[in-house]
C-alpha cells in the first residue's frame, strides 16, 4: 500500500494483541468485550490498559451485539451457552448503552464504528440472520439501539425515545424506564406525578 501511495494512511482491524498491531498507521480494535468475552464493564479496564501501554497507536474501535426484536424479556448481560438462539433485544440495548457510557469518558480513540446498521442473512446462524444490526433484516423496524445513536449522532433532528416498549410481559413491582433524548432532559410522569430521572450516559 505504501508503495502505491505513501500519502495515504494504512488501516487494519484487529482482535489480537501483540506486534501485529504495529504494522499499519491506524488500527481499529474489534475486541468484542462484553460480547464473546468478559462483560461490558471490562471495557473501562481495557481502555485504561490501552492508554497506559498502547497509547502510541492511533486507535479506533468497532463493536456490536446481537438482538432479536421478537425476543423480549431477560436482558441479562451474561451470555449463555445457547446465546445464538436467545438474543433478546434488551441485552443488545444495554450493551450499546454501556459502550456509550465508557466511550464518552475516553479521549484516546480517533473513531467509533458500529459493526453493522442492518441485520443480514447468514447461513452460520440458526435463524439464518446475523442480528447485530440496529435495524431488522426487512429494513422496516428500528431496534432501540438505533434510536440511541440517532440521539447521539444526529445533530439536525431531535430524538426522544422510550426503550423497551416491545416488552409486553414484565415481572416485579419496580420497573426502570429508559429514555434517549437529544431534546433536553425528559420529564417522566406516572399518574400525574413527576418522577426523578438520573443520567446514565450521554443522551440516556
Predicted regions and their residues:
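Substrate-binding/catalytic cleft of secreted carbohydrate-active enzymes
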Residues: 1-176, 192, 201
